[in-house]
C-alpha cells in the first residue's frame, strides 16, 4: 500500500520563501462567501477591522442589491416596499444526493419585506421566500441539475476615465481623445480633432462642441474663458460655438440625441439629468469612482456613482493639457491592456449582477400591482412575484458563457478551471473582434496572470490563468505580493500591490543574492521598472523584492520542472496537456517534481483531508473513522469508482492505517491522480533518446510490451447510458424483459424487470434495458379481431426501443440506478421511469494513444515492441520507451533532457564525496548531498537544480547490484539492441522521465461504417463518429483518383456509395441475388442543385449526349418494389441531424 512510502522530497531550491502558497480556491470561495454574507466572510471582515485593514468589503453582495432596490415606490409616492435582512435556510439535500438525483444544490433564500403606506404611516412586515439559491460546494463548484459546473471569472475593462493618443496620417499631428466609461449608463467621449477643436460625443451620438456641454451645465463664456482661456484649442472651439445661452445649448444637445422630436427646455434638461446625474440610470460603481478620483486627483466620496460637474470639467482640462503638451510625468495617456485598467468580475459579482437584473424586472411587477390592488388588502407577499429573480439566476447557471461544465479529467484540470480568467462572455470581448494587443503578454501581467498558460487556437491570450500568489482586491483588481525593502535591507513585511501601485516602485527579483542579515549581497541590483524595463541600480534605491521565483506563473506551469530551460511555446503545451492527463489504475508521484504537487492536490479537493486531529479508529475501502482528541468521532466517506464529467474514474483510497495518529489538515485518503497526497498525473518510465528503425519518426513513440502486461498505463473509463419510459399518444412505454422477436440468449443477462445485472460483460449492440413502445393501431382484419377477442390485449402491437450498447463501446456493468414516479422520485413531466446504467472499461495502452511529457513533448504510440526486442542497458534492464532525439533541438524544450538525467539520479540514489567545489558546497548547504535509491526530488521553477549540479550528481550516483555505475557525467549509457544483442555504435541518453497518458485515446476516435443514417436533403451519409457517419471523400481525394484515371472507382464513390438513392438499393439487390452491379443513376445532390437553381428562376434542363432531355423523377416505382422484396423499409425517415441520431 502507498502509505508506507514517504512523500518527502529532497529539494534543490536555494531560496527560502517568506510566504506560503495561498489557498488556491480563494478566488472562488471568498467571492461567493461575500455574495451570500457567510460566517467565513463575517470572520474576515472582523479580522480586517481589528487589524485596521480595508481590503475586505463590509457589506455582503446580496445586502448591497437589496439596499439598492429599496424602497420600491409607486408612481405617486404614496406607498413603498423595502427589503432587508436576507437569510438562508439549510439546504434540503446534500451535494451527493443532488448529484444522484439530478437536482441543484441550493438553499431557500428568505428576505424580510416591509410595506409602508406613506399616507397613513402603517407598516406591514413579512418574511418572503425569494426562491432556491444555488450554493457553492466546499470545492468551489456548483451542482446544477446533477452536474458539477464552474463559474469562470471574467476580465473586463474597468469603469473609469481613459485618455488615448492617435496619429492623424494627413496632418502628422497627435490627436487626443478621452472616454468616461461607467459600469452602467451612457458613455461620454471627448476628442480634439486636427483643426484643434474640442468635441464631445454623448452616448455614441453625433459630435458637438465641448463648450455646448459646458454651457448646458450652466457655464457662461466668461467662466469658460477664465478656466480654459490659456488653451488655444478651447478658444478656437468657443469661437466656432454659436449657442448663446444655457437654453440654446440644452436644445442643441437634445436635437443631436433625439433627432426628429420637438425639443423643449424641460425635456432637454431632464434628458441631460437622466443621462449622467441620475443614480437609477447612471452608475460608475465604487471601482469607477475610485479610478476617476485617482486619475483626475479628485476627492469625491466613494459612494457617489454619478458624474459631477467637477468630473466633467477636470476631464476636459486633462484632455486639453495633454494636447497642449503638458509634463508627461503628470499627464499621460492610458494603456487599455494594462492590468490597472482591467478588473476581474468574480463569481460573486457575476451572480450579483444577475440577481440585480431579476430584481429590476420584479420591481416593474411590484409597481404595477401597487396601482391595481386595494391599499388596505396589500401585503408584501401579494406584491412580490419571485419568478423573474429565480428565472434570471437559473438562466445564468444554465446558459451563460461563463458558467461552464467542469473539467474533471484530473484534479489539476478542475483546479485550473476554477482559477481561469476569461476576457470573453457578456460585456467582454468576442473572439472575432479581439486584436493582437489584447491577447499579448503585458508587463503588468507579472505575478497576476500567467504568461504561459493559455489555449492554443482562436482563444489564445483571451483566456488565462491566475498566477500562483495572486489575489483579487475588493475593487476586482489583481494584486501580487512583494517583500518591502527599507534602506537596502529586505524585511519580512509583505505588501500586496495592484498593477498601478507597482508601476510607482522599483522591484528586485526573487533570486537576487542576499546576505544573512537581509541586505543585498552585491553592490548593483538588477531591478524592474515601469513597463518591464530592467536595469542595475544601487541597493538603497530598491523599494520591493519578489516573494518567490514562481510568482509569475500559474499552478499548472509551476508543476513543470526545469521550466526555465523550455521554450515558452512548448511550456504552454506542457501546461495544457497536464490537464488532459487520465487517472491511471495506480498513480505514481513524479521522481522529479517541483514541490508544488502536494499543495495542488490538496487544494484541488479530490483528496480527503482530516478536519480535526485524532487517531484512526476504523477504516475500510469505503470510509475512515477518526476518534478526535476531544472524544468526538467523525467518519469520512470515500468516493468509489464514480464517473467524472469527462468519463474518467474518480476513486479514493485510504493512505493511513488503523491506530495511526493524524493531524488537522493531513491528507488521509488519495483521490484520482494523487499518490500519498501529491499530484501524480503520470508514470516514471525508463527512456532512451534514439531513433529506432524509423518507427519513431516525427514524434512517434515506441513502447515496451511490459507497460501493457503490467497495466502500467491502464486507466478505467466509465460511460453512463440512460433510457426513460414516457407516456406516448398511443399509450405508455414500458420497461420489460418481454421484448418482441428477440432470442432468449440476448436476454440472458437481464433481470426480471428487463434491466441488465451488475457484473455483466457487454459488447456493442447488447441490450442494457429492455423497453417496448406501443405501435400505431392499424385497421384490423377479421382474423386479428377474433384473436383479440380470444386472447385480449396480449396481441397488441409494440416495437422494440430497448437501450443498447452503442457502436465501439464495451465493458462491465458496474452500477444501475432506477428512478420511478411510483417510488416518489422527481422526474420530468411525461416520464414515468428512468434507468441509468454505468459501464466501466479498463483501457490498456495501445498503438494510436497519445502520450506526453510535461515539457510539451507529445507523440502518438507507433509500435509496442516485445520486452525482449527493446534496447537494454549493460545490466540487462530493457528501456520502457524510446523517443526520437530529433524532437528536442528545434523545439528548444531542453527541460526534458535535464529531467531525464535528474530522474536517473533520483532513481539510483547518490552520495556526494567530500570536496570544495561550489556545487558540492551548495548541495551540502541545502541537505541534498546524499539520498537512497527511489527518492523523489523537487526542482522548483526558476530555482531548481543547476547544470553543474546534475553533472556532478550523475558522477556520484550509487552503483547497481553488480557494483557498476551504468551512467556517468555524460548522462549517456551503452545500449544493446534487444534483437541482436549487439551494442549500438554510440552512447545513448538514458534516464527516467515522467510520462502522461492523455485523454485522446484511439478507442474513442476509431470508427467504421457499412450502412447507416443519411442526410435528409442531400441523401449523403452523415459525418462523424457521433452520428455513425461515413468517411468524407473530399475534393482533394477526388483529384487524386482523377489523376490516376480511376474512372469507375470514382463513379462508384460519387454515386452508389454516396447519394444515388435508386442505385444504392439496386446494388444491394444485385449483391443479394448474385447479379452484376447495374449502371449508377443520378446523385441526389445533383437533383438538389437543379432545384436550387430553379428556385432562383433559372430554367435548367438536363440533356443526354445526343441532346434528348433527361426526365428526373423524384421517386422510382422499381426501387420501392425491389426494396419491398428485400424487406427494406424505405418510407422510414432517416435522421437528418445530430439531435435526431
From Swiss-Prot:
GO cellular component: DNA-directed RNA polymerase complex
Record GO biological process: DNA-templated transcription
EC number: 2.7.7.6
One Gene Ontology MF term: ribonucleoside binding
Signal peptide (from-to): none
Stored InterPro entries: DNA-dir_RNA_pol_bsu_ext_1_sf, DNA-dir_RNA_pol_bsu_external_1, DNA-dir_RNA_pol_su2, DNA-dir_RNAP_su2_dom, DNA-dir_RNAP_su2_hyb_sf, RNA_pol_bsu_bac, RNA_pol_bsu_CS, RNA_pol_bsu_protrusion
This protein's UniProt keywords: DNA-directed RNA polymerase, Nucleotidyltransferase, Transcription, Transferase
Chemical reaction(s) catalysed: RNA(n) + a ribonucleoside 5'-triphosphate = RNA(n+1) + diphosphate
Presence of the UniProt keyword Protein biosynthesis in the record: no
NCBIfam families: PRK00405.1, rpoB
Chain's role: DNA-dependent RNA polymerase catalyzes the transcription of DNA into RNA using the four ribonucleoside triphosphates as substrates.
Record note on quaternary structure: The RNAP catalytic core consists of 2 alpha, 1 beta, 1 beta' and 1 omega subunit. When a sigma factor is associated with the core the holoenzyme is formed, which can initiate transcription.
Family under the similarity heading: Belongs to the RNA polymerase beta chain family.
Protein name, per record: DNA-directed RNA polymerase subunit beta
Species for this entry: Frankia alni (strain DSM 45986 / CECT 9034 / ACN14a)
Amino acid at each position: 500500500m502507498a502509505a508506507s512510502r514517504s512523500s518527502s522530497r529532497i529539494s534543490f531550491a536555494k531560496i527560502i520563501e517568506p510566504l506560503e502558497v495561498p489557498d488556491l480556491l480563494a478566488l472562488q470561495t471568498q467571492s461567493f462567501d461575500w455574495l451570500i454574507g457567510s460566517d467565513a466572510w463575517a470572520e474576515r471582515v472582523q479580522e480586517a477591522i481589528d487589524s485596521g485593514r480595508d481590503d475586505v468589503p463590509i457589506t455582503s453582495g446580496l445586502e448591497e442589491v437589496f439596499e439598492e432596490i429599496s424602497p420600491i415606490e409607486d408612481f405617486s409616492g404614496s406607498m413603498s416596499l423595502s427589503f432587508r435582512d436576507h437569510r438562508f435556510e439549510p439546504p434540503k439535500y446534500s451535494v451527493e444526493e443532488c448529484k444522484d438525483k439530478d437536482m441543484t444544490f441550493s438553499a431557500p433564500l428568505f428576505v424580510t419585506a416591509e410595506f409602508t403606506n406613506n399616507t397613513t404611516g402603517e407598516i406591514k412586515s413579512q418574511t418572503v421566500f425569494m426562491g432556491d439559491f444555488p450554493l457553492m460546494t466546499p470545492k468551489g463548484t456548483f451542482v446544477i441539475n446533477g452536474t458539477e459546473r464552474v463559474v469562470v471569472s471574467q476580465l473586463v475593462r474597468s469603469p473609469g476615465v481613459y485618455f488615448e493618443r492617435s496619429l492623424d496620417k494627413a496632418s502628422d499631428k497627435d490627436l487626443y481623445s478621452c472616454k468616461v466609461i461607467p459600469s452602467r449608463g451612457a458613455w461620454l467621449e471627448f476628442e480634439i480633432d486636427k483643426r484643434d477643436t474640442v468635441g464631445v460625443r454623448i452616448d455614441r451620438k453625433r459630435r458637438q462642441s465641448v463648450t455646448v456641454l459646458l454651457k448646458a451645465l450652466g457655464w457662461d463664456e466668461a467662466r469658460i474663458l477664465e478656466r480654459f482661456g490659456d488653451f488655444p484649442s478651447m478658444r478656437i472651439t468657443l469661437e466656432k460655438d454659436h449657442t448663446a445661452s444655457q437654453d440654446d445649448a440644452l436644445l442643441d444637445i437634445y436635437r443631436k440625441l433625439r433627432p426628429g422630436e420637438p425639443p423643449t427646455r424641460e425635456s432637454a434638461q431632464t434628458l441631460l439629468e437622466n443621462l449622467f446625474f441620475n443614480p437609477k440610470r447612471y452608475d460608475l460603481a465604487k471601482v469607477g469612482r475610485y479610478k476617476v478620483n485617482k486619475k483626475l486627483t479628485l476627492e469625491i466620496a466613494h459612494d457617489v456613482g454619478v458624474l459631477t460637474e467637477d468630473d466633467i470639467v477636470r476631464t476636459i482640462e486633462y484632455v486639453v493639457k495633454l494636447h497642449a503638451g503638458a509634463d508627461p510625468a503628470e499627464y499621460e495617456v492610458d494603456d487599455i491592456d494594462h492590468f490597472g485598467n482591467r478588473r476581474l468580475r468574480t463569481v460573486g459579482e457575476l451572480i450579483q449582477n444577475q440577481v440585480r437584473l431579476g430584481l429590476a424586472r420584479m420591481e416593474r411587477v411590484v409597481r404595477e400591482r401597487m396601482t391595481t390592488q386595494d391599499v388596505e388588502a396589500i401585503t408584501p407577499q401579494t406584491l412580490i412575484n419571485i419568478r423573474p429573480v429565480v428565472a434570471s439566476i437559473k438562466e445564468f447557471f444554465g446558459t451563460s458563457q461563463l458558467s461552464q461544465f467542469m473539467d474533471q479529467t484530473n484534479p489539476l484540470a478542475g483546479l485550473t478551471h476554477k482559477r481561469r480568467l476569461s476576457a470573453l462572455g457578456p460585456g467582454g470581448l468576442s473572439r472575432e473582434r479581439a486584436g493582437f494587443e489584447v491577447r499579448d503578454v503585458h508587463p503588468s501581467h507579472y505575478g497576476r496572470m500567467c504568461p504561459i498558460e493559455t489555449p492554443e487556437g482562436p482563444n489564445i491570450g483571451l483566456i488565462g490563468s491566475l498566477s500562483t500568489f495572486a489575489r483579487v482586491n475588493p475593487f476586482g483588481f489583481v494584486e501580487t505580493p512583494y517583500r518591502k525593502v527599507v534602506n537596502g535591507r529586505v524585511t519580512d513585511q509583505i505588501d500586496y500591490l495592484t498593477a498601478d501601485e507597482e508601476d510607482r516602485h522599483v522591484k528586485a527579483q526573487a533570486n537576487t543574492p542576499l546576505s544573512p542579515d537581509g541586505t543585498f549581497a552585491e553592490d548593483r541590483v538588477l531591478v524592474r521598472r515601469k513597463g518591464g524595463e530592467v536595469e542595475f541600480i544601487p541597493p538603497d534605491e530598491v523599494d520591493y523584492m519578489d516573494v518567490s521565483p514562481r510568482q509569475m506563473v500559474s499552478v499548472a506551469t509551476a508543476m513543470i520542472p526545469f521550466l526555465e530551460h523550455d521554450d515558452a511555446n512548448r511550456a504552454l503545451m506542457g501546461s495544457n496537456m497536464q490537464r488532459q492527463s487520465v487517472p491511471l489504475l495506480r498513480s505514481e508521484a513524479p521522481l522529479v517534481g517541483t514541490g508544488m504537487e502536494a499543495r495542488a492536490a490538496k487544494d484541488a479537493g479530490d483528496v480527503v483531508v482530516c478536519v480535526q486531529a485524532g487517531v484512526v479508529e476504523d477504516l475500510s475501502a469505503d470510509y475512515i473513522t477518526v476518534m478526535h482528541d476531544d472524544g468526538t468521532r467523525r467518519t469520512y466517506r470515500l468516493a468509489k469508482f464514480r464517473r467524472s464529467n469527462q468519463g474518467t474514474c474518480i476513486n479514493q483510497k485510504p493512505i493511513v492505517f488503523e491506530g495511526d495518529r493524524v493531524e488537522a489538515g493531513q491528507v488521509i485518503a488519495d483521490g484520482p491522480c494523487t499518490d500519498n497526497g501529491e499530484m501524480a498525473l503520470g508514470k516514471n518510465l525508463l527512456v532512451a533518446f534514439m531513433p529506432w528503425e524509423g518507427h519513431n519518426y516525427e514524434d512517434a513513440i515506441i513502447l515496451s510490451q511490459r507497460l501493457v502486461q503490467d497495466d502500467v498505463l491502464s486507466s478505467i473509463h466509465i460511460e453512463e447510458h440512460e433510457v426513460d419510459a414516457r407516456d406516448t399518444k398511443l399509450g405508455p412505454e414500458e420497461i420489460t424483459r418481454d421484448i418482441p422477436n428477440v432470442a432468449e440468449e440476448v436476454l440472458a443477462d437481464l433481470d426480471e424487470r428487463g434491466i441488465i445485472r451488475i457484473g455483466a460483460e457487454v459488447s456493442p449492440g447488447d441490450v442494457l434495458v429492455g423497453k417496448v413502445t406501443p405501435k400505431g393501431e392499424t385497421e384490423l382484419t377479421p382474423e386479428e379481431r377474433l384473436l383479440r377477442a380470444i386472447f385480449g390485449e396480449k396481441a397488441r402491437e409494440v416495437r422494440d426501443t430497448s437501450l443498447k450498447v452503442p457502436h465501439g463501446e464495451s465493458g462491465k456493468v458496474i452500477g444501475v440506478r432506477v428512478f420511478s414516479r411510483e417510488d416518489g422520485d422527481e422526474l420530468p413531466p411525461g416520464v414515468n421511469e428512468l434507468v441509468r446504467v454505468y459501464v466501466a472499461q479498463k483501457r490498456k495502452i495501445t498503438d494510436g494513444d497519445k502520450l506526453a511529457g510535461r515539457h510539451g513533448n507529445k507523440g502518438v504510440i507507433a509500435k509496442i515492441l516485445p520486452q525482449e526486442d527493446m534496447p537494454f542497458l549493460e545490466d540487462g534492464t530493457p528501456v520502457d520507451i524510446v523517443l526520437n532525439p530529433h524532437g528536442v533541438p528545434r523545439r528548444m524544450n531542453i527541460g526534458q533532457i535535464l529531467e531525464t538525467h535528474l530522474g536517473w539520479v533520483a532513481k539510483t540514489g547518490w552520495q556526494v564525496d567530500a570536496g570544495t567545489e561550489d556545487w558540492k558546497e551548495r548541495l551540502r548547504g541545502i541537505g541534498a548531498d546524499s539520498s537512497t535509491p527511489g527518492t523523489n526530488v523537487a526542482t522548483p521553477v526558476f530555482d531548481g537544480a543547476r547544470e553543474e549540479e546534475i553533472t556532478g550528481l550523475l558522477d556520484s550516483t550509487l552503483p547497481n547490484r553488480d557494483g557498476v555505475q551504468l551512467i556517468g557525467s555524460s548522462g549517456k549509457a551503452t545500449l544493446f539492441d534487444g534483437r541482436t544483442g549487439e551494442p549500438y555504435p554510440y552512447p545513448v541518453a538514458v534516464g527516467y522521465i515522467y510520462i502522461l497518458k492523455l485523454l485522446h485515446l484511439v478507442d474513442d476516435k476509431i470508427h467504421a461504417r457499412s450502412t447507416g443514417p443519411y442526410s435528409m436533403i442531400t441523401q449523403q451519409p452523415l459525418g462523424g463518429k457521433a452520428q455513425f457517419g461515413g468517411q468524407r471523400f473530399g475534393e482533394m481525394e477526388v483529384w487524386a483518383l482523377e489523376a490516376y484515371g480511376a474512372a469507375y472507382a470514382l463513379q462508384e464513390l460519387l454515386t452508389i456509395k454516396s447519394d444515388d438513392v435508386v442505385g444504392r438499393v439496386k446494388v444491394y439487390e444485385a449483391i443479394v441475388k448474385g447479379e452484376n452491379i447495374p449502371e449508377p443513376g443520378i446523385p441526389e445532390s445533383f437533383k438538389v442543385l437543379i432545384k436550387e437553381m430553379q428556385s432562383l428562376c433559372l430554367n435548367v434542363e438536363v440533356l443526354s449526349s445526343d441532346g434528348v432531355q433527361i426526365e428526373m423523377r423524384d421517386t422510382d416505382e422499381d426501387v420501392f418494389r425491389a426494396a419491398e422484396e428485400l424487406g427494406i423499409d424505405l418510407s422510414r425517415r432517416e435522421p437528418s441531424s445530430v439531435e435526431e441520431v
